Amino acid sequence: MAAARKQNTRKRRVKKNIESGIAHIRSTFNNTIVTITDTHGNALSWSSAGALGFRGSRKSTPFAAQMAAETAAKGSIEHGLKTLEVTVKGPGSGREAAIRALQAAGLEVTAIRDVTPVPHNGCRPPKRRRV
């Protein structure tokens, strides 16, 4: 009558052999999120500055973006990834640092695309800061 052992319900990660993929870099003023997917958009690995333990204003630094890109690249290299297209979205400071970190991790960057959404005079922007 001992307590029943809880079964491990977590699914094991299957190693996929994928040659090329897409790195989606979302760089805001507060954080940088790097997601590496296959060409169909299925996520292989992801990382962000906040997930690595950077908090507050340190989350928005280029160094935090570099570390996030390195962590995501390591996870995708385990799946056999070799070449990448990079799509960058947002105005943050970690854009260039994340791209350089992906190249330094051993991934070949074939294209860099800026997909930052630009409004055709849509929503009213937030009020200007007075510091």
Curated annotation (Swiss-Prot):
GO terms for cellular component: ribonucleoprotein complex; ribosome. Signal peptide: none annotated. Keywords: Ribonucleoprotein, Ribosomal protein, RNA-binding, rRNA-binding. NCBIfam families: PRK05309.1, uS11_bact. Belongs to the universal ribosomal protein uS11 family. HAMAP family: Ribosomal_uS11. This is Small ribosomal subunit protein uS11. It comes from Bacillus velezensis (strain DSM 23117 / BGSC 10A6 / LMG 26770 / FZB42). The gene is rpsK.
